[in-house]
Amino acid sequence: MKSKISEYTEKEFLEFVEDIYTNNKKKFPTEESHIQAVLEFKKLTEHPSGSDLLYYPNENREDSPAGVVKEVKEWRASKGLPGFKAG
C-alpha cells in the first residue's frame, strides 16, 4: 500500500475509497482488514473529519466515493497540501 496520497492518482484513490465504501471482500476479506483500510484512509487524507468523511457526509456534498474524493481533493488544495500524482 502507498504511504502518501501524492503516490496515488485520483483514479487509484477513488478505487480505494470505492473498495472501502462497498466493503470489497476481495480487497478486505476480514473485518480487521477493512478497519485497517479505513485507518489508512484517515492517515492518507490528513482531513480533520477522518473516517466521518466516509460514514457521515457533509450535507453539501454528494454521498458517494466520488464525493469523498472531491472533498478530500478540495480540502487538501485549500491547505496547500500535496494532491494526487498526475496520471
Swiss-Prot record:
Protein name: Pyocin-S1 immunity protein
GO biological process terms on file: bacteriocin immunity
Species this chain originates from: Pseudomonas aeruginosa
Coiled coil location: none
GO molecular function, one term: toxic substance binding
Pfam families: Colicin_Pyocin
Family the entry assigns: Belongs to the colicins ColE2/ColE8/ColE9 and pyocins S1/S2 family.
Record keywords: Bacteriocin immunity
